[in-house]
Amino acid sequence: MVSVQKVPAIVLCSGVSLALLHVLCLATCLNESPGQNSKDEKLCPENFTRILDSLLDGYDNRLRPGFGGPVTEVKTDIYVTSFGPVSDVEMEYTMDVFFRQTWIDKRLKYDGPIEILRLNNMMVTKVWTPDTFFRNGKKSVSHNMTAPNKLFRIMRNGTILYTMRLTISAECPMRLVDFPMDGHACPLKFGSYAYPKSEMIYTWTKGPEKSVEVPKESSSLVQYDLIGQTVSSETIKSITGEYIVMTVYFHLRRKMGYFMIQTYIPCIMTVILSQVSFWINKESVPARTVFGITTVLTMTTLSISARHSLPKVSYATAMDWFIAVCFAFVFSALIEFAAVNYFTNIQMQKAKKKISKPPPEVPAAPVLKEKHTETSLQNTHANLNMRKRTNALVHSESDVNSRTEVGNHSSKTTAAQESSETTPKAHLASSPNPFSRANAAETISAAARGLSSAASPSPHGTLQPAPLRSASARPAFGARLGRIKTTVNTTGVPGNVSATPPPSAPPPSGSGTSKIDKYARILFPVTFGAFNMVYWVVYLSKDTMEKSESLM
């Protein structure tokens, strides 16, 4: 009985053990099957091929996702790898970006062990992609070196990520009224070319604030500072419908260093140089003329060169106003010198006329006639006296002179003439009449004629001149006669008052400082300094940043 009862117990224990072993084996198999399947799939790319083939089987890339149904939403974001350059002349800017688009296409859902299918650009042409274009783009280039720079990924739930590397040249409208203290908001506008908002819309992937990324190292510009960016969206109406347009505004502020060195400082120095001429003597006409003309030409050159870096706008910029005012100061300095020179010449001419103006004139002809008559009467009395004295001398010394040869007639006659000049000479010296000296020649001639008549021929037919009383008186009388002749010869034409004109007054001198120069030395610098103060305070304190449409 004992042996019969033990056999069923052993059989029961062995059955339980087998059941436990079977459960453990099953659990082990279940735990190892996912790993084995994934390992098999990694080792077998044919599985991916089957997945892709199944996705594209019956897929029509001509139809948008949800065609005839809900609106397709395309989420976008931009990563800027390089910003610039910015051209003021062409009013455009260039940047290099990664442009990302994300949408959901339920036709591309799949079931598989991999969450994301990372594919190359070959898959892009086989599926539907948004027809995004840049509305204000002048030129957009997709990079293809060394292969097309495109990224395409399909997620298990049918979400598509499509990324391209683009270089975009976009238009940037600029209003240069405040140039070069200006700021601009350069837009980048993109949207669908064919699908209106009833079929496709655009949104920002990470929200308006973080969907556009511009690293600091990517925004280093020469003439501008990129101070930020803002985003917005708008709806544009056309004859084909309403379209959603996404816009990114890149806010740029111009750097002034280049323009200060190239334009502002040279203009200020040129104006100061033109005002140096106020301190130069007004008689230095060449020096002041060179100052004026040189500074005017310099300002002309600066104004032309300043416009080379700007488009040909029809309005005046802030720099144009500054250059125009500087040019006005320089030109006014030249006009100021012209005024100084003009008024100085007028003053000198007035002074010369005042000095050279003769005293009030009296009738000259009667006076001269009266003086001439007086002189003739004096000469007549002198001739009579001379004749009387000559006759006395002839009678008193006839015996002595009878032995004198006729050959000495000329010398004795000359001596007699010299003696006859004593009375006229004394009369000329004592006479206050200035015309008596001028008529000395006539007096001498009359005396000579008297001597000739006194020396009449003798009864014997010989010429008997009237000699002087003594021979010692002849030299002195001859010397006096020579002085009288010299006086007559130096007087020139008879009737002249004097051979040497009276000393005239010196011409008026134009030396000294003009009142206009004195006023200009103060007025010009003060006015120019006040202009600079107002100019820089207004423009530096003014908000010259152009407002974007999203902030208006």
UniProtKB/Swiss-Prot annotation:
Task: Show the InterPro entries listed in the entry.
Answer: GABAA/Glycine_rcpt, GABAAa_rcpt, GABBAa4_rcpt, Gabra-1-6_TM, Neur_chan_lig-bd, Neur_chan_lig-bd_sf, Neur_channel, Neuro-gated_channel_TM_sf
Query: What membrane topology is annotated for this entry?
Result: Multi-pass membrane protein
Q: So which stretches are on the Cytoplasmic side?
A: 281-284, 342-515
| Alphabetized UniProt keyword annotations | Cell membrane, Chloride, Chloride channel, Disulfide bond, Glycoprotein, Ion channel, Ion transport, Ligand-gated ion channel, Membrane, Postsynaptic cell membrane, Receptor, Signal, Synapse, Transmembrane, Transmembrane helix, Transport
Per the entry's comment, what about the domains? The GABA-binding pockets are located at the interface between neighboring alpha and beta subunits.
One GO BP annotation here? chloride transmembrane transport
Question: Which stretches does UniProt call biased (Low complexity)?
Answer: 448-458, 486-499
GO molecular function annotation: GABA-A receptor activity; GABA-gated chloride ion channel activity; transmitter-gated monoatomic ion channel activity involved in regulation of postsynaptic membrane potential
What's the subunit arrangement here? Heteropentamer, formed by a combination of alpha (GABRA1-6), beta (GABRB1-3), gamma (GABRG1-3), delta (GABRD), epsilon (GABRE), rho (GABRR1-3), pi (GABRP) and theta (GABRQ) chains, each subunit exhibiting distinct physiological and pharmacological properties.
Q: Which cysteines are joined by disulfide bonds?
A: 172-186
The function of this protein is: Alpha subunit of the heteropentameric ligand-gated chloride channel gated by gamma-aminobutyric acid (GABA), a major inhibitory neurotransmitter in the brain. GABA-gated chloride channels, also named GABA(A) receptors (GABAAR), consist of five subunits arranged around a central pore and contain GABA active binding site(s) located at the alpha and beta subunit interface(s). Alpha-4/GABRA4 subunit often assembles with delta or gamma-2 subunits, in combination with beta subunits.
What name goes with this protein? Gamma-aminobutyric acid receptor subunit alpha-4
| Stretches assigned to coiled coil | none
One Pfam assignment = Neur_chan_LBD
Quick one: where's region Disordered?
A: 353-436, 448-470, 486-513
